[in-house]
Regions:
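Conserved, single-site charged/polar hotspot
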Residues: 1-287
Length: 287
């Protein structure tokens, strides 16, 4: 462990073996109570993602590849979890490969019944990312996650609240928002047009769209009746918008960016890697 002085405080730089790193990442990213096969796949995906990030420095000024947040993978400090460690040990060295290269195995919490492709982030499909396709997360009995709280959700946002948030999030004085138009759709919403009394604004890609409509000040109701306060990002970009007299009703599904593996979907099924990452295979890595 190395400690350096940063602009806003101390920076702790932790260098450790990948397998030890994973013993903290897996329980931070997926509940240890999940099916062992799902935990194993989480370990393989987290390992693959880590090796891909090791090809360059995410923080070159500190010679660090990643940080411990959701910007990369959550590396928390939970107490040792036997089942998570078992999953890491059982898959030791295994990674997801595509066309001879370690795949960038993105994952997220919950799907709405389908995933999306890298188009959601403005990246066109090519020979290197062909494993990140939009797939239906369903079987003979329907969508695997249909009974989970975040499978469907909705938010009734007062026009005044949304108008204030949009101004804060975009830094543009559009005034009162009169309409939200979905102008491009993937499976996820890829572009929206915000029409205000003082002007319009177009927002592209799922993360920027979720950020534009996110923020504190309203509530999100999950399909099980649970209500949670809004946060800096809309739960997902799988949504529709309805305009009422004084509210915008956003009806959505899933939680997270929607690219790659749905963690809750993985917990509900068997052949996981080949399902979410089309054309990819689990193999022993070279790292």
């Amino acid at each position: 462990v190395e400690i350096r002085c940063g602009t806003n405080g101390l920076i702790l730089i932790n260098e450790l073996p990948v397998e030890r790193y994973l013993c903290k990442v897996v329980p931070s990213e997926m509940p240890p109570s999940y099916e062992l096969e799902a935990l194993k796949v989480q370990a393989v995906c987290a390992r693959s993602y880590a090796y891909r990030q090791m090809t360059s420095y995410g923080y070159p000024e500190y010679e660090a590849h990643i940080d411990d947040s959701t910007a990369y993978q959550v590396y928390g400090n939970p107490k040792p979890q036997e089942r998570s460690t078992q999953a890491v040990n059982a898959t030791c060295g295994e990674v997801v490969m595509y066309h001879g290269q370690i795949a960038t195995t993105y994952y997220y919490s919950t799907s709405c019944g389908e995933t999306t492709s890298l188009e959601a982030w403005g990246t066109p499909a090519n020979d290197e990312n062909g494993y990140l396709q939009a797939v239906e997360v369903s079987g003979k009995v329907g969508d695997y996650e249909k009974d989970l709280p975040w499978y469907r959700w909705e938010a009734a946002i007062p026009v005044q609240t949304l108008s204030t948030l949009v101004e804060q999030n975009l830094g543009k004085g559009l005034g009162m928002i009169r309409d939200i138009q979905v102008t491009k759709k993937g499976p996820v919403v890829l572009q929206i047009k915000l029409i205000g009394e003082n002007g319009d604004a177009t927002v592209d890609t799922e993360n920027k769209i979720r950020a534009a409509l996110g923020g504190n000040g309203y509530e999100i109701k999950k399909q099980d009746g649970g209500v949670v306060p809004s946060s800096k990002l809309l739960p997902s970009a799988f949504f529709t918008v309805e305009k009422g007299a004084d509210i915008f009703l956003i009806k959505g599904g899933g939680y997270g960016h929607g690219i790659g593996m749905s963690q809750n979907g993985a917990n509900e099924m068997a052949e996981i890697v080949e399902f979410f990452f089309r054309g990819a295979k689990v193999q022993m890595g070279t790292g």
